[in-house]
Amino acid sequence: MVDGKSAIARCADVAKFQSLAAIDVPGTRAIVNPGGTNERFAKAHFKQAQLIAYPDNVTIFDQIIKGKADIMVTDGSETLWQSKLHPELCPINPGKPLQFAEKAFMLPRGDVPFKEFVDTWMHQLKATGEYDQIVDHWLK
């Protein structure tokens, strides 16, 4: 699955945050969960925006809804999922991520038959359109 970092904000604020440059301005409060790729991305790209470290991944999006933060940058797939859970939040350009990443299955090293099985299974899912149906069901 092709993915990458994308932003999520209150739906009313989406127009303000269409690019990294638009996010990284004084006065923007970007919330991050400490210790992962989201924090690394924010620290690398946001020099003027205020970074707010928030340790609870379960309620971090509620902080945006409550107005305690303006935006979060996370995986594009997560912005789609969270916007389904929280209709007040909207993903910002998840189809055009701020950087490129791919999702993968972790498989046992050296288990070639199992890897070939998974590769065939994924190929069939994509060829039949079932993969897109699954993504649409869960993320769109």
Protein language model features and the residues they cover:
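Short helices/loops that flank or line small-molecule/ion binding pockets
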Residues: A21-A22, A44-H45, V58-S77, L85
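Hydrophobic residues within well-ordered alpha-helices
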Residues: I23, I64-I65, F105, V118
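Short, well-ordered beta-strand segments
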Residues: R29-V32, M72, M106
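Periplasmic-binding protein-like
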Residues: M1-S6, G76, L80-H123, K140
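Flexible hinge/capping segments at coil-to-helix
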Residues: R10-R29
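Short helix-initiation/N-cap motifs at beta->coil->alpha
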Residues: A15-Q18, I52-K66, A101
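Beta->alpha turn/N-cap motifs
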Residues: R10, P34-G36, D56-N57, V73-Q82, ...
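Ligand-binding clefts/hinges and TM-proximal coupling segments of bilobed small-molecule sensing domains
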Residues: T37-Y54, P91-P94, M122-K140
